[in-house]
Design a protein with these regions (language model features):
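Compositionally biased, disordered extreme N-termini, encompassing classical targeting presequences
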Residues: 1-3, 104-105
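Coil-to-beta-strand transition motifs
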Residues: 2-3, 31, 45
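Active-site-flanking beta-strand signature of metal-NTP-handling nucleotidyl enzymes
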Residues: 3-10, 49-51
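Short, surface-exposed ligand-recognition loops at beta-strand->loop->(often short) alpha-helix junctions
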Residues: 9-21
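Short, charged/polar surface micro-motifs in flexible loops or helix N-caps
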Residues: 14, 44-45, 55-60
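An amphipathic, aromatic/His-enriched active-site/gating alpha helix that lines ligand/cofactor pockets
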Residues: 25-37, 53-88
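Short beta-strand micro-motifs enriched in acidic
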Residues: 39-42
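Short, low-order "capping/linker" segments at domain edges
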Residues: 89-105
Length: 105
């Protein structure tokens, strides 16, 4: 089964993390079987990376996505974003470490 990573790098406007986070969504917005992380730069507290991991068939994953809801979510976050860096869906090609104790490809 293929694992995918949705990842975005955002530079937030100063002091807007709480508002951005509220617009980003809740645990209930995460697809079943997925896990999401939000991390903050140690050198720039306004730079955050949000990423989520999900296993499955990409066509099936896309079929469960609500494009209108995602567009509304993006619009709600936009006022708090100064800039966006990397932003996309990536295929996990290696998993290394703690979960399995082994390297898999």
């Amino acid at each position: 089964m293929t694992t995918y990573c949705a990842l975005t790098v955002r530079k937030l406007k100063p002091g807007t993390y709480d508002e951005w986070r509220k617009a980003w969504g809740t645990e209930e917005d995460i697809p079943e079987g997925a896990e999401a992380y939000i991390v903050r730069s140690l050198t720039d507290p306004n730079e955050i990376i949000a990423f989520g991991l999900i296993e499955g068939d990409m066509d099936e994953i896309k079929a469960t996505m609500d494009e209108d809801k995602e567009r509304t979510r993006q619009e709600a976050m936009a006022p708090y974003i100064e800039s966006t860096g990397a932003d996309g869906i990536y295929e996990v090609i290696e998993r290394i470490g703690a979960r399995t104790g082994a390297t898999t490809t």
